[in-house]
């Protein structure tokens, strides 16, 4: 009986530390971009190409990262009205096909 209990314990330990047991989904190991400071200036919508929201629990603040037409990324506070207006403008641009 002691041998079977010891064997069972050994198998459980081996299963816990096997490579498959240590494997994690790629999303867990993916790098997270966080914003620690926000821009103090309003950015003209003509300079903006796209945006993405940052809502990761690994980041200290929720944020919006705007990407400009020259590929510069700028962190902004999603609570500010100009940020919300800029996101709305970009959303409408995507929905409206260009001739």
UniProtKB/Swiss-Prot annotation:
It comes from the Eukaryota. Residues 1-23 form the signal peptide. The modification Pyrrolidone carboxylic acid is found at residue 24. Pfam families: IL8 (PF00048). Processing at the N-terminus can regulate receptor and target cell selectivity. Deletion of the N-terminal residue converts it from an activator of basophil to an eosinophil chemoattractant. N-Glycosylated. Disulfide bonds join 34-59, 35-75. GO terms for biological process: antimicrobial humoral immune response mediated by antimicrobial peptide; chemokine-mediated signaling pathway; eosinophil chemotaxis; inflammatory response; positive regulation of cell migration; positive regulation of synaptic transmission, glutamatergic; sensory perception of pain. Acts as a ligand for C-C chemokine receptor CCR2. Signals through binding and activation of CCR2 and induces a strong chemotactic response and mobilization of intracellular calcium ions. Exhibits a chemotactic activity for monocytes and basophils but not neutrophils or eosinophils. Plays an important role in mediating peripheral nerve injury-induced neuropathic pain. Increases NMDA-mediated synaptic transmission in both dopamine D1 and D2 receptor-containing neurons, which may be caused by MAPK/ERK-dependent phosphorylation of GRIN2B/NMDAR2B. Belongs to the intercrine beta (chemokine CC) family. This is C-C motif chemokine 2. It comes from Macaca fascicularis (Crab-eating macaque).
